[in-house]
């Protein structure tokens, strides 16, 4: 039993938050003791664990199937909470997304059901500014993207002049999310754009103009 808090500020995967883990109502640790899923860096927990076992040093919890099951249950509780917000309290979900979109992307990348539920609201950088995926998807069934930042920097101006919308998928999870969503939605097509390919197409257009 316990309480999970969504932190009101942005956190990083490399930074460990302070928690309170009790074992049979006695303070065991201010670490999460591996109770939280690896992606839940935006969560702080206050938990009392009666059915789990402590290590001999009484500084952490024994890593066994009981701990694994508890971690899975906590992960499901977090996902259920976010799912409920999307369905019933969009304003609150948007507030959490504004602060923790990177972590929400991490959740969606490992859970197809939540990917379908969250994807339209997730922000992606494009050559026309940051847009929700729903906005990108509604513009065209063909989604153009680049895999690395250098390619994106080179193609964004040319693509903009041609009226193309290009997603910068260089950030962690972005390309994975695009590919997984496309596999789940075959009506969508992903088109990886590179500077060389864009210049070739631009050259072909210019050659046709000269020929005419």
Kindly label every feature range from the protein language model:
Residues 1-212:
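Conserved GHKL (Bergerat-fold) ATPase module
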